[in-house]
Amino acid sequence: MHQLTLAEIARGLADKSFSSEELTGALLARIKQLDPQINSFISVTEDLALGQARAADARRAAGETSALLGAPIAHKDLFCTNGVRTSCGSKMLDNFKAPYDATVVAKLAEAGMVTLGKTNMDEFAMGSANESSHYGAVKNPWNLEHVPGGSSGGSAAAVAARLLPATTGTDTGGSIRQPAALTNLTGLKPTYGRVSRWGMIAYASSLDQGGPLARTAEDCALLLQGMAGFDAKDSTSIEEPVPDYSASLNASLQGLRIGLPKEYFGAGLDPRIADLVQASVKELEKLGAVVKEISLPNMQHAIPAYYVIAPAEASSNLSRFDGVRFGYRCEEPKDLTDLYKRSRGEGFGVEVQRRIMVGTYALSAGYYDAYYVKAQQIRRLIKNDFMAAFNDVDLILGPTTPNPAWKLGAKSSDPVAAYLEDVYTITANLAGLPGLSMPAGFVDGLPVGVQLLAPYFQEGRLLNVAHRYQQVTDWHTRAPNGF
């Protein structure tokens, strides 16, 4: 059963080939057997899962037919889950049990999904390798000496290892799309405001967005259907109707205009990845798409702008973790200042401390205009580039990452080298656009992804193109050895 996709599970549950309880038991056993190799879970919620599975079976027996009813899910460990540890991969929240469900968790639970656990992640979602977690690095199932990407590395590795068919992740600068690319998955970052952020512990509030990770575009469509929608509890949620994503999966690509930004194919891109991107373009042309070169001139400024804005927002968001109300508290502080300093110094890891310091500096008197305001101006220019491009094309296509997965520890001493791996993904977050990564081949036995970007709220178009591509290629069907 572990080889089944989410869509196949939905069909199997509907025709009573197996029950949710049987499926849940099989996957929990598989997690117990195989996860020690990859460390993709922080918490496994066995009792909760079996209870939810029995309830889902009862709902189905009573006549309910929802596609997600009884299907398994695991949540990135920054989605608050009532009564379950929600750690953000940090010592700071090691003992924090959320007193409520995040909207994403609640919506999927209402749809009948079964929560198998909480997945490992870079601490407070700050990282591109899933090496900064308090609970240890996650390993890439395709090669256990390599990173799975981050920050949703646990969510990606768990699906790649066939521990379950789908997971939730979050994407602040590529944290769904990049690990999806490095583990041979389909990962979708929705439009900013499409999926509620309520109960999703924030890294950078103007950039964070939750979304699905799965093996196929068909599965991402099913999961997004359950996650998306307006939420009055989230002030950044947008009241936009949610279309039937699955219904548009088989639309024709005839005449679809796809733009290839010339800036994506310069220095820094592994030429073998460039070749795989071109191969995917040829497949889409065979399906009727029309491809042309475009320009996104301000992309060159994206990384410096992002690494001012995101740390600035993080320094503000993480100021609440001070050892007073909840979270880690140091032992026997001398006074209040000592409590703050030691609780934060001992509770936060190195990468989180680095970004808090960068962000605090960027927001400080005398530097605010020089750094933060300037970064926001660049953000506007990047958004304008996309708006101009979408006057001429329907989608933008390029590599998801400049390189395949690197070895564990290879970039630990040079954080900027790791930051550069986000070069193709962060622009979508700065502009708030939807983006999708889909499997496109392998380099040295390691997976590579192709990224698609669309105008606001055109997730259906992204899923349609990815689904049609997956009907004529088999990259997404390949599984790592030993899993």
Curated annotation (Swiss-Prot):
It is an enzyme of class 6 (ligase). One of its GO terms (molecular function) is glutaminyl-tRNA synthase (glutamine-hydrolyzing) activity. It comes from the Bacteria. One of its GO terms (cellular component) is glutamyl-tRNA(Gln) amidotransferase complex. InterPro entries: Amidase (IPR000120), Amidase_CS (IPR020556), Amidase_dom (IPR023631), AS_sf (IPR036928), GatA (IPR004412). Its EC number is 6.3.5.7. Pfam families: Amidase. HAMAP family: GatA. Heterotrimer of A, B and C subunits. Belongs to the amidase family. GatA subfamily. PANTHER family: GLUTAMYL-TRNA(GLN) AMIDOTRANSFERASE SUBUNIT A, TRANSAMIDASE. NCBIfam families: gatA. This is Glutamyl-tRNA(Gln) amidotransferase subunit A. The gene is gatA.
